[in-house]
Amino acid sequence: MGGVAAGTRWIHHVRRLSAAKVSTDALERGQSRVIDASLTLIRERAKLKAELLRALGGVKASACLLGVPLGHNSSFLQGPAFAPPRIREAIWCGSTNSSTEEGKELNDPRVLTDVGDVPIQEIRDCGVEDDRLMNVVSESVKTVMEEDPLRPLVLGGDHSISYPVVRAVSEKLGGPVDILHLDAHPDIYDAFEGNIYSHASSFARIMEGGYARRLLQVGIRSITKEGREQGKRFGVEQYEMRTFSKDREKLESLKLGEGVKGVYISVDVDCLDPAFAPGVSHIEPGGLSFRDVLNILHNLQGDVVAGDVVEFNPQRDTVDGMTAMVAAKLVRELTAKISK
């Protein structure tokens, strides 16, 4: 299914429900049942995985993959909705070994586990709108976090998912986090094209909600006047690529999370120069090298409590899946930061 088809499918289903003259009460009941079933699915999977980890013992924190295949809040292409299964395939494809660079073994369930995807399309097919859909994503993340020692590592999807995920993490932990955000764009518009949940507005929602104390944005090279003004409004630390050579030493020795509930890392694949990751919706030359990103991640000091990898667009990837492998490696190295 193409990206446009995925984005318009929800409209077709809403029209069909309207044409069928489904009553508002019946539709509401149906939506509630679908949402409840979705949360039950995630809850039971998380409980199953956590019971195994508790039985095995010797683990304080385990990275837990949760897919959120949502792409309709993208302002350009909606292919990121198809990313989670492609990333999983690349993680386990066998072309590389199962260890992270820091020596964590991904085949050990105490290091990495997986509870599958939030059924976003099925929820949207019954007419659920974005306010409620964002709540479903948040509740799914909280459901994972209820099962100690699981910590969510979320596979997007477009960048709009970061708002409900960070909100859930902050609410569940009882306070704000520090965020390291790697991206070509600041994603801090108050609203983009009238959409407050746009992938270009996720960090405005996070900051106005008080879910982050510090927000560091690294890799920025496509920023408007509003992006800079919003950054100043929220006290965001924006590190643009035009000054990266000067900022490199600082960014490769970050210490975050003291005095708050931990560190959240959000990686938009387009933070990378398109020479390393062409499979993105918004190709922006002049980005970070893959080793730049790994140096920042590996050297970061702080308790990483959750994270996401977003905006990989399989529909723009190379034939051999180069960007899928890049996204998979990002997941592997984030797993090493989260698991303990």
From Swiss-Prot:
GO terms for cellular component: mitochondrion. Mn(2+) 1 binds at residues 159, 183, 187, 268. GO terms for biological process: arginine catabolic process; putrescine biosynthetic process from arginine, via agmatine; urea cycle. This is Arginase 1, mitochondrial. Mn(2+) 2 binds at residues 183, 185, 268, 270. Substrate binds at residues 185-189, 193-195, 311. It is found in: Mitochondrion. Its EC number is 3.5.3.1. Its cofactor is Mn(2+). Pfam families: Arginase. Belongs to the arginase family. Pathway: Nitrogen metabolism; urea cycle; L-ornithine and urea from L-arginine: step 1/1. The keyword Mitochondrion applies. Gene3D superfamilies: Ureohydrolase domain (3.40.800.10). Its main location: mitochondrion. Residues 1-24 form a transit peptide. Catalyzes the hydrolysis of L-arginine to urea and L-ornithine. The latter can be utilized in the urea cycle or as a precursor for the synthesis of both polyamines and proline. Keywords: Arginine metabolism, Hydrolase, Manganese, Metal-binding, Mitochondrion, Transit peptide. It catalyses: L-arginine + H2O = urea + L-ornithine. Binds 2 manganese ions per subunit. The keyword Acetylation does not apply. GO terms for molecular function: agmatinase activity; arginase activity; manganese ion binding. PANTHER family: ARGINASE/AGMATINASE, GUANIDINO ACID HYDROLASE, MITOCHONDRIAL.
